[in-house]
Amino acid sequence: MSVMLMHIHLPHMNVNNSHISKAQVKWVRSLQMKKHRDEQGVFVAEGEKCVNDLRQSFELLMHITPDNASSTEIEQMSSLRTPQGIIGVFRKREDQVPSPAVLADGQLLLALDGIQDPGNLGTIIRTCDWFGIYDIICTNDTADCYNPKVVQATMGALARVRVHYVNSLPKLLEQFQTAGYPVYGTLLDGKNMYVPTAIPTKEKGIIVMGNEGNGISEDVRKLVTHSLLIPSYPVNTPTSESLNVSIATAIVLAEFRRQHNKKS
């Protein structure tokens, strides 16, 4: 099996080689850095399932297997402690940021305000895939969705969930708010989300989740129309300061879907 490589032009590279070259190994390894991923417009995924899922939605540029690379070379290119033996290099996808005009009935969007941890972002993407949220809007200081750790944590969900980065999340939220869509935010002074009136019957809207340490930024907080709280149990008893943001996201999305199913 030959190394698949299309449209990417690298020096001293013979695409007809049956075995991966040193230049290719070095190039794939360099894609662990965001700078090089952005310059080339590509990203790396590992593992048979993840690669197979992603090739349904992304253009596969390079497919590396034990047939065309040694275990040492795969280890050099891998970002995992225990390489899975299959590596794919994909071209990034250009998706249009959703607008109020194209938001379908029953469609929810998720907005992430400064999520820093790649593992959290990857888990959130995977959670959105489970709960039928297919667009995530991120501030530019949110972790890169093409970071190898994020891609790995999504377990292939990146093939079905579109992740968008915007220069101004407040500006985008204003557009949705003006169009009459609710903007939900998880805040410590929010309303217990398990109270029936906390989540309106209108299913359209944007759910905002904030930074791991600081929560939702002040500029975004001002645009939240429905403040929600995930209560501790028993309510109002001393407990941990906060939930992990990926766990909190899963709880919120599960409750939205539960209430929507109950009302429909």
Residue ranges and their predicted role:
Residues 41, 112-116, 233-241:
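Short pre-catalytic strand/loop immediately N-terminal to key active-site residues, enriched for Gly-Thr
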Residues 72-90:
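Glycine/small-residue-rich loop that forms an oxyanion/phosphate-binding "nest" at active or ligand-binding sites
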Residues 7-64:
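Boundary-proximal intrinsically disordered activation/regulatory segments immediately upstream
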Residues 101-190:
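RNA substrate-binding interface of SAM-dependent RNA methyltransferases
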Residues 1-6:
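Methionine residue identity
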Residues 185-240:
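Active-site/ligand-binding-proximal alpha/beta "capping" segment
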Residues 130, 145, 152-157, 218, ...:
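Structured adenosyl-cofactor binding patch, chiefly the S-adenosyl-L-methionine
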